[in-house]
Structures are given as structure tokens and as C-alpha cells.
């Protein structure tokens, strides 16, 4: 089942489009990576999906619900998140403590999710 869809995403900064007509779909449970050179629009795509950057065209759909106009903090509550390319972690904290910080808005117990992450990435 496809859980997150970006249709015809067009967005940019200062009136200049950085991404144009991007289509993206992610199935439930998938880990998705966007790879490309500096300035290719990777962060722009992610910011658009998260609502941190307004689209000039396109739609974002999550679990069959239109969320294009939804605030970023409400998208996080749905479980939509990304890890930016910069080193945006708390260096004085352990991996587990950083994961807990990332899940602070969740209402459920995140311990099961953290265990799944350790199974996926045992080197952590």
C-alpha cells in the first residue's frame, strides 16, 4: 500500500523553482533515500513533503488523505519525518536518546519502534 505520495511537486525559493513536476511515492514501512549532488533539490523535495516549504504546484497525499495545506507540526504527528543531510543530532546524547527526541510528539510507546530501528541498523 502506498502511504505517501507527492504529485507534480513544484517549489522553490524567491520565485525561482528548484524542483519542477516531481512525482514520488513511498509504501508503508519503506525507508526511502533521495540521493543527488549539491543543489539538486533533495532538501527542497523533503521540505515540500513536510510542509516546511509551500508548493507552487502539486499535492501531497498521506494514507489517502490530502495534506497539502496541513501544517508541518500536524504532519509530524501523523508520523511523517526525515533525516536531513546536515548533522542535526545532539552530539552529547546517545543514538537512543536522539531517537527518543525525534519521537517526542508521538502518543504511543516508542520503545518498539526503537527496537525495530536497532534490528534494521544493528551497528547502532
Residue locations for each model-derived region?
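Conserved ABC transporter NBD signature motif
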Residues: 4, 58-66, 78, 110-114
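ABC-type ATPase nucleotide-binding domains, specifically the catalytic core motifs of the NBD
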Residues: 14, 32, 93-112, 120-123
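Short coil-to-beta microelement around the adenine-binding A-loop and adjacent beta1/P-loop entry
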Residues: 16-17, 74
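Short beta-strand immediately N-terminal to the Walker A/P-loop
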Residues: 32-33, 82
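The feature captures the beta-strand-to-loop junction immediately N-terminal to the Walker
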Residues: 35-37
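Conserved Walker
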Residues: 43-44
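Helix-to-loop junction immediately C-terminal to a conserved catalytic motif
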Residues: 50
Amino acid at each position: 500500500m502506498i502511504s505517501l505520495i507527492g504529485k507534480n511537486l513544484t517549489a522553490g525559493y524567491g520565485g525561482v523553482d528548484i524542483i519542477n513536476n516531481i512525482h514520488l511515492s513511498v509504501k508503508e514501512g519503506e525507508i526511502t533515500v533521495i540521493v543527488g549532488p549539491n543543489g539538486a533539490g533533495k532538501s527542497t523535495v523533503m521540505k515540500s513533503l513536510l510542509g516546511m516549504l509551500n508548493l507552487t504546484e502539486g499535492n501531497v497525499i498521506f494514507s489517502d488523505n490530502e495534506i497539502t495545506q496541513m501544517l508541518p507540526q500536524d504532519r509530524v504527528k501523523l508520523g511523517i519525518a526525515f533525516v536531513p543531510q546536515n548533522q542535526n543530532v545532539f552530539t552529547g546524547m546517545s543514538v537512543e536518546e536522539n531517537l527518543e527526541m525525534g519521537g517526542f510528539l508521538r502518543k504511543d510507546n516508542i520503545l518498539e519502534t526503537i527496537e525495530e530501528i536497532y534490528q534494521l541498523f544493528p551497528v547502532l
